[in-house]
Amino acid sequence: MFNDLLSELTKNILEHGGKKLIVPNEFCECVSKQGNCKLNSWLWDVPGFRRWRVTRLDAGDRLQVLNSVAYPNEQNDMPIMGIDLLWFEKKQKLVAILDFQPLVQDKEYLDRYFDGLKSLKKSFNEFNSDMKSNIYDPTKYFSPWALFCKGGNFEAENILPKIFSSFLKCYWKNLDLSKANENHIKSQEVSILHIDYDKYSAEKDPAHGLFSGFFGKEWSEKYMKEFLFPLSLENINP
C-alpha cells in the first residue's frame, strides 16, 4: 500500500527539478530490532522550496505510512504542503490527511491560496470528514479545507489515488501562482512561522509514540527533531 503514491510523488518532484539530498544513514533506512518494521526517509532539493522531506514506514499488515512535508522558500509565503497517509491492513482502515497548511489564518491569505483545495473538498465527499483532534488545534496549522478521510479499502483503492494526483497538481499550480503574485508576508516573518510550525509539530505530532514503539524512544526523539522538524531546535529571534 502507498508504493504507487510514493512513486507518483517522486515522479512529480523529479519533473519539477528535484534532486535527492544525502540523508544520514541512521535516518535513511531504519529497521526495528524485531525486524517487523522498516522506515525509509528521503530529502529533496526542489526549486522554490527550502526543504522537502518524505517518509515511508512499512510494518507489514500492521501498518503502512506515507508522510511528506514541503516547505516553500522563505521568499514565498504560500502554505506548507502536508501529506499523512496511514493504512491498517488487518482492520482494513484508512486514515488520510492532505492539506495546504496555512502560515496565517486571515481571510486575504486564505483567499489567495485555497481555491483549489476548496474545489477538491467539494468534489470528493469521501475526504470531507470532520477533523476533530484532541492533539492538534485545527485552527493553528490546518486549513478549513483539509482533506480528511477515515475510510476502508474502497477509499484506499479507488478514491485516494485520484485525490492524491489532484492534490499534487493543485499545489504545483499554487507555486506557479505565487511566482506571479507579490508576497504579503515578509521573508523574515515566513522564516519565523516555519520555525514555529516545526516547534508546534515536534511537540504535538503523534508519530513520536508510533516511532518509539518500533524503534525506541531515543532514536525517535532524534528523528523527530533532526529530520522531521529540524527547525524546532532553532530559537525565534523577534
UniProtKB/Swiss-Prot annotation:
One of its GO terms (molecular function) is cobalt ion binding. It comes from the Bacteria. GO terms for biological process: phytochromobilin biosynthetic process. It catalyses: 15,16-dihydrobiliverdin + oxidized 2[4Fe-4S]-[ferredoxin] = biliverdin IXalpha + reduced 2[4Fe-4S]-[ferredoxin] + 2 H(+). Its EC number is 1.3.7.2. Signal peptide: none annotated. Keywords: Oxidoreductase. InterPro entries: DiHydbiliverdin_OxRdtase, Ferredoxin-dep_bilin_Rdtase. Belongs to the HY2 family. Catalyzes the two-electron reduction of biliverdin IX-alpha at the C15 methine bridge. This is 15,16-dihydrobiliverdin:ferredoxin oxidoreductase. It comes from Prochlorococcus marinus (strain NATL2A). The gene is pebA.
